[in-house]
Amino acid sequence: VHLTPEEKTAVTTLWGKVNVDEVGGEALGRLLVVYPWTQRFFESFGDLSSPDAVMGNPKVKAHGKKVLGAFSDGLAHLDNLKGTFAQLSELHCDKLHVDPENFKLLGNVLVCVLAHHFGKEFTPQVQAAYQKVVAGVANALAHKYH
């Protein structure tokens, strides 16, 4: 991902304020509610029968935290996202058979959640930088599919 020095600063500064546990669970939960067909990858998570059930599900929250932990690793290696996400790309492609379009959806949901949490601090410039990052991460996760 090519980010200007200002964009890198904007991304890392905001990310330093992110509560990964809270934002991760909310982002994954919103993905499952807004795009219900994605729930098929999480059938082992128990009750996903309603938006409240999804958002309160401890397995959704725990996996969301794990997902955002991996995203944090990507932020530390913006110049090598494909390498950073190679194993996760392989896992999601070969073993889990996740449609790579879902990575884009999750990235966009994450941007919405960040905007919700940070309000005015999440300026258009910060959003533009994050859109680049989530697109780069989605591309890296889809790399094994090509």
Curated annotation (Swiss-Prot):
Coiled coil feature spans: none
Where in the sequence is Phosphothreonine found? T12
Q: Which residues carry this modification: S-nitrosocysteine?
A: C93
Q: Does the keyword field hold Isomerase?
A: no
Keyword check for Nucleus, yes or no. Answer: no
Q: Which residues bind heme b?
A: H63, H92
**Tissue-specificity statement:** Red blood cells.
Sorted alphabetically, which InterPro entries does this protein's record hold?
Globin, Globin-like_sf, Globin/Proto, Hemoglobin_b, Hemoglobin_oxygen_transport
Q: Which residues carry this modification: N6-acetyllysine?
A: K59, K82, K144
Q: Which UniProt keywords apply?
A: Acetylation, Heme, Iron, Metal-binding, Oxygen transport, Phosphoprotein, S-nitrosylation, Transport
Q: Which residues form the Globin domain?
A: 2-146
Which positions does the record annotate as the modified residue Phosphoserine? Answer: S44
Q: Which residues carry this modification: N-acetylvaline?
A: V1
Q: What are the record's GO terms for cellular component?
A: blood microparticle; haptoglobin-hemoglobin complex; hemoglobin complex
One function term, GO molecular function aspect = organic acid binding
GO biological process terms, semicolon-separated = hydrogen peroxide catabolic process
Which N-terminal stretch is annotated as signal sequence? none
The similarity annotation says: Belongs to the globin family.
Q: How does it assemble?
A: Heterotetramer of two alpha chains and two beta chains.
Outline what the protein does: Involved in oxygen transport from the lung to the various peripheral tissues.
The protein's name:
Hemoglobin subunit beta
> Native species of this protein?
Chlorocebus aethiops
